[in-house]
Regions:
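Single-residue signature of alpha-solenoid repeat helices
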Residues: 51, 85, 115, 151-152
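Intrinsically disordered, low-complexity segments enriched in Gly and acidic/Ser/Thr residues
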Residues: 89, 97-104, 110, 114-120, ...
Length: 205
């Protein structure tokens, strides 16, 4: 691709308000985004390898770009280079606190305590409850055999969010409900304190 293909278009007036500007991503950036979505939908080594040349050029041009680094981490994960992917996520989380970064790093983490701490941070750094439900379900899974009261708290929050969004209860969630039957969940204050302690016990870097 030429330099022109990598050049973002001149900002144009935004429909959101007078005086504001939006920048149209370059052709190459748009292709990279499409390739990443395809990889997420079909996470195969072949698809990762196809995207690699474009991604490597993007990294050469924008070595600190958050999206490019994230895409590279996902490709490394698919290709089995887990340590390289983890290094990138840790680098990203030194300067960014996006909830999905914590969750994606959690998926690469084997230690149950560290994994739980990362999902705690994903929950804390996501303002919209509807996007927390998946993180809460993952945390409940991790806690169900270790701390049933906290697992019950997260599961109830997850179920409430799913109902608000019009989602049904899956077979897995039904099984978890049965497993936690009769368990009294902790309070909001107790769980917030738990998040804090987990983050202190398992620092990211």
């Amino acid at each position: 691709m030429s330099d022109e293909d990598w050049r973002s278009l001149t900002p144009v007036p935004s429909p959101k308000g007078e005086g504001s500007k939006v920048t149209i991503p370059s052709v190459a950036q748009q292709l990279l985004t499409c390739a990443f979505h395809e990889i997420q939908e079909d996470a195969t080594v072949d698809n990762a390898l196809k995207a690699m040349p474009l991604l490597q050029e993007a990294m050469r041009r924008y070595p600190r770009n958050k999206n490019c680094l994230r895409y590279m981490a996902v490709v490394y994960r698919i290709m089995g280079e887990k340590d390289k992917a983890i290094d990138i996520y840790q680098q990203l989380l030194k300067h960014n606190c996006d909830s999905y970064l914590y969750a994606e790093l959690a998926e690469l983490t084997d230690d149950p305590g560290k994994k739980a701490a990362l999902f705690c941070q994903a929950i804390q750094n996501q303002r919209q409850e509807k996007f927390r439900s998946g993180y809460r379900l993952e945390l409940s899974r991790l806690l169900i055999d270790r701390d049933k009261s906290r697992a019950a708290y997260e599961l109830l929050k997850c179920i409430a969010s799913r109902k608000t969004q019009g989602f049904g209860i899956t077979k897995e969630i039904q099984q978890m409900i049965q497993q936690l039957s009769g368990v009294q969940p902790v309070t909001d204050a107790d769980q917030q304190e738990f998040y804090k302690k987990m983050v202190e016990k398992y620092p990211i870097c």
